[in-house]
A protein has these predicted regions:
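Amphipathic alpha-helical repeat scaffolds of TPR domains
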Residues: 72-82, 124-141, 173-198, 228-240, ...
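Short alpha-helical DNA-recognition segment
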Residues: 16-36, 351-371
Length: 647
């Protein structure tokens, strides 16, 4: 019997985006089902299917269509629907929702079809929740606000916790809500507010519900990334209600907390709206002088957005209201799969695959994997062997992607990366020691996972040693190549055909950095372009991959400038800024503007460079950015130069 069909296919979501257990399961099951099956340390006994298949040279929908065409059709429909919502494309959205196939949600009479009894392999409640939410957005875009509110309430109720409920014990009740369910509640509350602008009793009720969610999400030990993602939306709506009810003072604390979270954890999608709201709060209370810092931050962020619009012609989220921004946040990226019992149907006997039910260990071990038996079908019909052949994996050799074997290890890895990003080298080194001990304690399952964990630790120690100037650039280059060689042959001419994990892309970027430091700019460009070409050709939308693309964009912008190729440099500056802001981040925008300013100074466009440096100096105050001191020095030097030339 062959084991672990999942190989490089299923596990990526765990590691690549540092997904906490409740994030991983969001979109697969309800929170109550998660608690039933998976309470504990990363005790996932069913894994998502949409993050998987790059190593096969096909995207996930290709693979799903091969395994279960019904699922492929649904996911294709859902992705088109979400795209239409984000683009406010009501013509396409109506066509998708009123289609006469099994994926249309609205029947010929204009009513929501009850499709819980169907042949889908996925959780029907989650499918219906998404579909009805989409119908509510169509109603909203076409101006039927009351109908939009009615439909979104119905969507909320598909997973059992409606926003009209009064929670006697909110800790007990609301802990069952996943991120997506919370977002659905917020959307419903937003429509409730819009439909009851003159109804104080309704506003009181909605405000109370939002207050419960605020206390729950920020005071329940929830993963900080979940808090950062959702708190600004809940807070904004809650504060808006308090202002409408004449209790502006009750909005000060959540509004300040929201701004603090976004600045600390690099989230920009709600930043401008929240800063405006805080300024309005202070004006309503007659103490606008206390909002001077927020006014300065707002002006700085508007300068960044104005700069991007001047360069590229448009700005992400421009003219988007609250609902549209909520629907662009990362919560909705969760995939629409199924409970642990149902997902096995995706692997039903098609092309020779048969299934064994996932074994659930008594202690919910992460070593539980999908067990797939080879069938007695003809070899060319054997799907498992087909995958192995396409991957080039010899029989008996397992090459699963890394995932941490305990929640503690997962958190340590996240803390290490943050410490290194903040140049807290001693702290990172100490955390690496703890991670090594935790991996030994928890066990990683097999030799390959041990190798990949070893690669992460080796790369981290190499970076720390180089940052601390304990090794030379040439020594660091040699160590990087040896570290990468544990899993990837970088000299392979077909490297663009190989699947590269996020960690491997990061090591490639480290190699590019060293070549740059050694003065070999052409080699630096070559390695940075490996990362860009890989991600762009696959249209990868994972935030972890986007982060690596941003590093590569900035590297290429700087390198092409060094090679006096200013047009190419400008192109990567525009791409980098747009990607950073459209992904909901924003911190690196100042870095790209700094690169632009430096280029303009090189071209003797001194006034343009001076203005850009001023934008950088102001913008660095928002999220914090290491370019501020350099920008101040360059601004002062350039200003003195301009003044001396004038005299």
């Amino acid at each position: 019997m062959e084991e672990e069909l999942v190989l490089r296919i299923i596990n990526e979501k765990l590691e690549y985006e540092h997904i906490a257990p409740e994030w991983l399961c969001d979109g697969i099951c309800t929170r109550s089902e998660y608690d039933k099956y998976c309470t504990g340390e990363m005790d996932i006994d069913y894994l998502t299917l949409e993050m998987m298949l790059e190593r096969l040279g096909m995207n996930s929908l290709d693979f799903i269509s091969w395994v279960d065409y019904d699922v492929y059709e649904y996911l294709e429909w859902r992705d088109k629907t979400m795209e239409a919502i984000r683009n406010k494309d009501t013509v396409t959205l109506r066509r998708l929702l009123y289609s006469d196939d099994m994926y249309g949600i609205v029947d010929v009479n204009g009513e929501i079809s009850d499709r819980e009894e169907n042949r889908w392999s996925m959780n029907p409640k989650l499918i219906m929740q998404f579909g009805v939410m989409a119908v509510s957005m169509l109603e909203w875009f076409e101006g039927r606000k009351a109908e939009a509110g009615r439909y979104v309430k119905q969507a909320v109720e598909y997973t059992g916790l409606g926003n009209s409920m009064e929670f006697e014990d909110e800790d007990t009740s609301m802990k069952m809500l996943s991120d997506k369910e919370i977002a659905m509640n917020v959307l419903s509350d937003y429509f409730e507010v819009e439909n009851n602008l003159e109804n104080n009793a309704a506003l009181e009720r909605t405000g109370r519900h939002l207050g419960q969610m605020l206390r729950y999400i920020d005071g329940n030990g929830r993963d900080i990334r979940s808090v950062v993602l959702l708190f600004p939306y809940i807070s904004y709506l809650y504060v808006r209600i308090q202002i409408m009810l004449g209790r502006a003072e009750q909005g000060i604390s959540p509004c300040k907390r929201s701004i603090e979270l976004m600045r600390t954890h690099n989230q920009c999608r709600m930043l401008e709206m929240t800063l405006r709201q805080y300024i309005q709060l202070m004006e309503n209370l007659g103490i606008s002088n206390r909002a001077q810092d927020e006014e300065r931050l707002l002006k700085s962020w508007q300068e960044v957005l104005g700069f991007l619009k001047r360069l590229s012609g448009n700005v992400p989220d421009e003219d988007c209201g609250f609902a549209e921004r909520l629907l662009r946040c990362g919560v909705w990226n969760g995939r629409a799969f199924v409970t642990e019992g149902d997902i096995i149907k995706l692997y039903r006997a098609r092309e020779g695959i048969t299934q064994k039910r996932l074994s659930i260990d008594a202690d919910y071990s992460m070593r539980s994997m999908w067990l797939i038996e080879n069938s007695k079908a003809k070899p060319q019909k054997n799907g498992y062997e087909k995958i192995r052949k396409r991957l080039g994996i010899p029989s008996g050799h397992i090459h699963s992607d890394i995932y941490c074997t305990s929640y503690k290890a997962y958190m340590l890895k996240y803390q290490i990366e943050r410490a290194m990003m903040n140049w807290e080298l001693e702290k990172a080194d100490g955390l690496l020691d703890k991670l090594e001990k935790e991996l030994i304690r928890a066990g990683s399952g097999d030799e390959v996972k041990n190798l990949i964990n070893k690669q992460f630790i080796m790369d981290s120690r190499n970076v720390i040693a180089y940052m601390a100037k304990k090794i030379t650039a040439k020594e660091y280059l040699d160590k990087c190549k040896k570290c990468l060689a544990l899993t990837v042959d970088i000299e392979n001419k077909k490297i663009d055909k190989v699947f590269l994990r996020v960690e491997e892309l990061l090591i490639i970027l480290h190699i590019a950095q060293v070549y740059r430091n050694l003065g070999n700019t052409e080699k630096a460009v070559k390695y940075s372009k490996i990362v860009i070409d890989y991600c762009e050709s696959r249209n990868i939308k994972s935030q972890a991959y986007i982060n690596k693309m941003l590093i590569a964009y900035h590297s290429l912008a700087s390198d092409y400038r060094s090679l006096n190729k200013y047009d190419e440099s400008l192109e990567y500056i525009k791409k980098g800024m747009f990607l950073d802001i459209s992904s909901g981040k924003g911190k690196l925008a100042a870095t790209f503007i700094f690169c632009y300013a430096y280029s303009q100074a090189k071209l003797n466009n001194n006034l343009e460079a001076l203005n850009a440096y001023q934008i950088v100096i102001n913008a660095c105050e928002i999220f914090g950015n290491s370019n501020r001191d350099k920008a101040v020095r360059n601004y002062t030097r350039l200003k003195n130069k301009i003044e001396s030339e004038d005299t």
